[in-house]
From Swiss-Prot:
Residues 125-131, 209-217 are annotated as: Involved in fusion and/or binding to host membrane. It comes from Alcelaphine herpesvirus 1 (strain C500). The chain crosses the membrane at residues 733-753. This is Envelope glycoprotein B. GO terms for biological process: symbiont entry into host cell; virion attachment to host cell. Keywords: Disulfide bond, Glycoprotein, Host cell membrane, Host endosome, Host Golgi apparatus, Host membrane, Host-virus interaction, Membrane, Signal, Transmembrane, Transmembrane helix, Viral attachment to host cell, Viral envelope protein, Virion, Virus entry into host cell. Glycans are attached at residues 51, 180, 258, 311, 364, 379, 385, 424, 564, 630. Belongs to the herpesviridae glycoprotein B family. Disulfide bonds join 69-527, 86-483, 158-223, 315-362, 552-589.
Length: 854
């Protein structure tokens, strides 16, 4: 991120510089008043400086190229860590040895898989007058049985037919509507080298029938074999192919009786093939060595891969770093491992991990070869002290520790063991002798030798213990001094950055950078390198102008060009070949002044603010303040990047989870496939129904086409009506109108219901609304109600009258139905004609009214 931000800063600075200085090109007189001598940094020095920067060698600041720097607030932000905690190793036991560090392998397990399937394409072709057309096309794929995959993997051949059972009926699809035969597989060109495909039919069979205006169904069967890579990550519960297929099982599943690997696929779809052979296409027909292969039938395709075992094929740990000068310190219940080559320490529990080599056989060769190479480097001074030890850190690292002992200590211990052995031998021999032999002359010599051996033993033991304690003390002091020195250096850099942040950061980076303190942090940005051949210093350092005769530049003015720019720009030469962007660094002119300015490989001498001569930089003596310490130089310390965010946090930070998306997509695709299979078993598959109906209509010829067109027209009409209603409802105004009508209907129903309730409660008031007025004015109008007997007579008369009218109405309806016929239709037609002429039918009257006319 730092390099990216600095690059962006450099481009922004370059753009700002072009906008600022494009309007101030130098005049011709200023161009002529430049120093003609060579004054630029040579290409060889620039190239050497860049190579040194790439190798981590800090170059002389005077060899930096001419450049324009600007401390921008948008640069990379840094701060110095001023608080460190050094380990307290006092009175601790220190051991030196070889440290091997293994990190957890996050690279997925990659293996080869093969995908087999047969793709069936059924097309309905219309033979038109002017052109043919594909009116319908259905594509589906099916898996391939193992007996046929053997032919595909060995001789690259397959059968061009497919048998499918639908609703208890066997359907046979044959390529080009021909007969079943063996066809060859041919390679297919692809974009990726990791995916290779072979197929048998590259073209779709779409030839129309011989009947003009007729429909014909064509079938294409294509055998396809895809060889690609699959990836799996721990805990190996699924793997994904490069073409997007997901298998919910471990790639190390083997169907063993004590199987521990996960398998989420149905057992009926899994097959283990023994002595299976896969041949490369170039060597088809040969007989390679057989192997065990796993097959899974996904209904739409078959997938296979070679059986592998986890502890052999996949290694959980990957070698990261090795150190032959590490220190192990015991701190109570934990162990601290420190190496001078990296700025980090590792701590683990003081218990070893026993099951590492048993579960991960792949580590044996790596550990053995790495230990052998590291021991060869320290073989002259150290020797192994015991066997290798294995520890696991809390961060998930595996540490392999091989204790070492110095050769001097080993020689001293060998001498001590030899003396002890000789002393024990002498003691044993003395006890077996008789008392008479103990009084012999030689017994005095043996006693003296035994005493001398005891003294020698104590001296050797003291020397051994003292040397061991001193070595431990030296290792302890080195460990603490190294930590304190790093802390002091960090504090020193922090304080120096307050004085000149650009020099400090350039020294740390080893290349020219621009730095500026913005509060408590430092903003660092790249410098823009100008065209080295265009940099020229002016002869005079006096400020031009009549009113500025007493002013002179404190730094010599310089003209330069940017790379890929033809305009000349003016500035002032700064320190270490830096070009200042302004010409405001002026001072009052003094008499008899001398100035020396370094630019590139030359030193420019100015007398009275006028250039006098140019001399090489080497002619000026240097003040050597470097004190050489005649010791072996400390090895370089490379700062390692500390992982701020864990792998899980990085995975969760993205908005797209590609693995989950693919798994869910394939999962629901398989669910739809299962649903389609169920529908096929129930003989209600829509595609099969449409295909069967289309075949029936084709067999009927013209009649079938007429029926098909009529059915299509009716279906289209109803579809248009339904679609129109749905679209009308979807429209905002239509939806509001519909809701308004529904509300009106609901209100009408409520009002009618209330009216019916009122009629049932008080029918007389509903029929005669003036009954209340009559009741209130009964005394004034002197109206007396009839008796209940008279009321019953009136109600009975009304009932009888209504009962007598019902048979007559039924007879009129029956007579009307009997008279309805051709004559009735004729009378109706005549009535229509009469109405057009202006005639109207007469109104009927009751019989008693007609008879009453005189």
């Amino acid at each position: 991120m730092a390099h990216t931000g600095s690059t962006v800063c450099a481009f922004l600075i370059f753009a700002v510089l072009k906008n600022v200085f494009c309007q101030t090109p130098t005049s011709s007189s200023e161009v002529e008043d430049v120093i003609p001598e060579a004054n630029t940094v040579s290409d060889n020095i620039i190239r050497q400086q860049r190579n040194n920067t790439a190798k981590g060698i800090h170059s002389d600041p005077s060899a930096f190229p001419f450049r324009v720097c600007s401390a921008s607030n948008i640069g990379d932000i840094f701060r110095f860590q001023t608080s460190h905690s050094c380990p307290n190793t006092k009175d601790k036991e220190h051991n030196e040895g070889i440290l091997l560090i293994f990190k957890e392998n996050i690279v997925p397990y990659v293996f080869k898989v093969r995908k087999y399937r047969k793709i069936v394409t059924t097309s309905t072709i219309y033979n038109g007058i002017y052109a043919d057309a594909v009116t319908n096309q259905h594509v589906f794929s099916k898996s391939v049985p193992i007996y046929e995959t053997r032919r595909m993997d060995t001789i690259y051949q397959c059968y061009n037919s497919l048998d499918v059972t639908v609703g208890g009926n066997l359907l046979v699809y044959t390529d080009n509507d021909g007969s079943n035969m063996t066809v060859d597989l041919q390679p297919v060109d692809g974009l990726s080298n990791s995916v290779r495909r072979y197929h048998s039919q590259p073209e779709i069979h779409a030839e129309p029938g011989w009947l003009l205006g007729g429909y014909r169904r064509r079938t294409t069967v294509n055998c396809e074999v895809t060889e690609t890579d699959a990836r799996a990550v721990p805990p190996f519960r699924y793997f994904i192919t490069n073409i997007g297929d997901t298998i919910e099982m471990s790639p190390f599943w083997s169907k063993a009786w004590n199987e521990t690997e996960f398998s989420g696929e149905p057992d009926r779809t899994l097959t283990v093939a023994k002595d299976y052979r896969v041949v490369d296409y170039k060597f088809r027909g040969t007989q390679p060595q057989g192997h065990t292969r796993i097959f899974v039938d996904k209904e739409e395709y078959t997938l296979s891969w070679a059986q592998q075992f986890r502890n052999i094929s996949y290694c959980r740990w990957a070698h990261w770093k090795s150190f032959d000068n590490a220190i192990k310190t015991e701190h109570g219940k934990s162990l601290h491992f420190v190496a001078n080559d990296i700025t980090a320490s590792f701590y683990t529990p003081n218990t070893q991990t026993r099951e590492v080599l048993g579960k991960h056989v792949c580590l044996n060769n790596t550990i053995e070869s790495e230990l052998k190479s590291r021991l060869a480097k320290v073989n002259d001074t150290h020797s192994p002290n015991g066997t290798a030890q294995y520890y696991l850190t809390n961060g998930g690292l595996l540490l392999v520790w091989q204790p070492l002992v110095q050769q001097k200590l080993l020689d001293a211990k060998g001498l001590l063991d030899a003396v002890k052995k000789q002393q024990n031998t002498t003691t044993t021999t003395t006890t077996t002798r008789s008392r008479r032999q103990r009084r012999s002359v030689s017994s005095g010599i043996d006693d003296v030798y035994t005493a001398e051996s005891t003294i020698l033993l104590t001296q050797i033991q003291f020397a051994y213990d003292t040397l061991r304690a001193q070595i431990n003390n030296v290792l302890e002091e080195l460990s603490r001094a190294w930590c304190r020195e790093q802390h002091r250096a960090s504090l020193m850099w922090n304080e120096l950055s307050k004085i000149n942040p650009t020099s400090v950061m350039s020294s740390i980076y080893g290349r020219p950078v621009s730095a500026k303190r913005i509060g408590d942090v430092i903003s660092v940005s790249h410098c823009v390198v100008v065209d080295q051949d265009s940099v020229s210093l002016h002869r005079s350092m006096r400020v031009p102008g009549r009113d500025k005769t007493h002013e002179c530049y404190s730094r010599p003015p310089v003209t330069f060009k940017f790379i890929n720019d033809s305009h000349l720009y003016k500035g002032q030469l700064g320190v270490n070949n830096e070009i200042l962007l302004t010409t405001t660094a002026v001072e009052i002119c003094h008499e008899n002044t001398e100035h020396y300015f370094q630019g590139g490989n030359n030193m420019y001498f100015y007398k009275n603010y006028r250039h006098v001569k140019t001399m090489p930089v080497g002619d000026v003596a240097t003040l050597d303040t470097f004190m050489v310490l005649n010791l072996t130089l400390v090895e370089n310390i490379d700062f390692q990047v500390i992982e701020l965010y864990s792998r899980e946090e990085k995975r969760m930070s993205t908005a797209f989870d590609i693995e989950t998306m693919f798994r869910e997509y394939n999962y629901y695709t398989q669910r739809v496939t299962g649903l389609r299979r169920d529908l096929t078993d129930l003989a209600t598959n829509r595609n099969q129904f449409v295909d069967a109906f289309g075949s029936l209509m084709d067999d009927l010829g013209v009649v079938g086409k007429t029926v098909l067109n009529a059915v299509s027209s009716v279906a289209t009409l109803f579809s248009s009506i339904v679609s129109g209603i749905i679209n009308f409802i979807k429209n905002p105004f239509g939806g509001m109108l519909l809701f308004g009508l529904i509300a009106a209907v609901v209100i009408t129903v409520i009002l009618l219901n209330r009216k019916a309730k009122r009629f049932a409660q008080n029918p007389v008031q509903m029929i005669y609304p003036d009954i209340k007025t009559i009741t209130s004015q009964r005394e004034e109008l002197q109206v007396d109600p009839i008796s209940k007997h008279e009321l019953d007579r009136i109600m009975l008369a009304m009932h009888d009258y209504h009962a007598s009218k019902q048979p007559e109405s039924k007879q009129d309806e029956e007579q009307g139905s009997t008279t309805s016929g051709p004559a009735d239709w004729l009378n109706k037609a005549k009535n229509v004609l009469r109405r057009r002429a202006g005639y109207k039918p007469l109104k009927r009257t009751d019989s008693f009214e007609s008879t009453g006319v005189p």
